[in-house]
C-alpha cells in the first residue's frame, strides 16, 4: 500500500517501505559521465495489478551521499511518484509528492529505463515480479507507453 499522505519530511511510523539489501541491488543504466549510481532492490518490487502500479526501492549512491527512495510507476499514463525517502540509514520520511509525468519537468531518466526494461509492457503493468527482475538485470527493452 502507498504510505499515507503526509507532509514532506514527516517521519513514517506505519506503511514503511520493504526492507532491502544493498548488496543485491540491480544497477540501472545511467547517462555517460554520471557520478551517481542507481540500483533497484529486487526484493522490494511489488505489483498492485488492480491499481496498475509497480512499487520498489531505489538506492542512489554518489561520491559523498547515499539516498533511498520508495517509488512507484503507473504504466497506464506514464506516471511515477516518490512515496518516501531516507538519507543513508536514517528514518523513512514522507516525500509529499503526487503522481507526475515521467516526461515532465521533474522527470528522472532512470524511471523511464525501469518502465522500458521490465516494469511496464506497453501501457500495462507487468504483473510478474520475476519477469520484472529478469528484465532489469538484462536491460530488456519493453515498449514503454507514452501517455
Write out the residue ranges for each language-model feature.
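A short, surface-exposed interaction/processing loop segment used at functional sites
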Residues: 77-103
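Residue-identity detector for glutamine
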Residues: 30, 50, 79, 87, ...
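Generic structural hydrophobic/aromatic packing signal, biased to beta-strands
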Residues: 28, 56, 80-83, 120
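N-terminal secretory signal peptides
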Residues: 1-72
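C-terminal partner/receptor-binding element of secreted or periplasmic proteins
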Residues: 93-147
Amino acid at each position: 500500500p502507498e504510505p499515507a499522505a503526509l507532509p514532506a519530511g514527516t517521519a513514517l511510523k506505519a506503511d514503511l517501505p520493504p526492507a532491502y539489501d544493498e548488496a543485491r541491488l540491480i544497477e540501472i543504466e545511467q547517462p555517460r559521465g554520471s557520478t551517481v549510481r542507481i540500483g533497484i532492490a529486487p526484493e522490494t518490487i511489488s505489483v498492485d495489478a488492480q491499481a496498475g502500479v509497480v512499487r520498489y526501492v531505489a538506492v542512489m549512491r554518489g561520491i559523498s551521499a547515499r539516498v533511498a527512495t520508495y517509488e512507484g510507476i503507473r504504466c497506464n499514463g506514464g506516471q511515477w511518484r516518490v512515496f518516501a525517502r531516507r538519507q543513508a540509514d536514517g528514518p523513512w520520511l514522507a516525500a509529499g509528492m503526487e503522481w507526475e509525468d515521467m516526461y515532465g519537468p521533474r522527470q528522472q531518466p532512470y524511471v523511464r529505463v525501469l518502465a522500458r526494461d521490465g516494469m511496464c509492457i506497453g501501457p500495462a503493468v507487468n504483473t510478474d515480479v520475476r519477469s520484472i527482475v529478469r528484465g532489469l538485470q538484462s536491460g530488456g527493452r519493453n515498449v514503454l507507453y507514452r501517455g
